[in-house]
Amino acid sequence: MMSNITDEGFILGCSAIGAGLAVIAGIGPGVGQGIAAGHAAAAVGRNPGAKGDVTSTMLLGQAVAETTGLYGLLVAMLLMFVKPLLP
């Protein structure tokens, strides 16, 4: 059944699957950043005087959370364009 699959085709197929899974890593940071922004907006609504502190803390937290998504994108791009293990 799998006798006609070449090594190159198998590696490229696995790379595509891995890239798809790596892109899924972007879902978590997106949801987390949306929740954080919503809570920050609610906090500023309750206490407008704390706008600067809330905004700076939110942006720092979102920058840290975004690194996971960026690493997933980097892994996906490497898997799709570098063609690992191929001569």
Question: Can you describe what each PLM-predicted range is?
Answer:
Residues 1-87:
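Hydrophobic, small-residue-rich transmembrane alpha-helices and their short perimembrane loops
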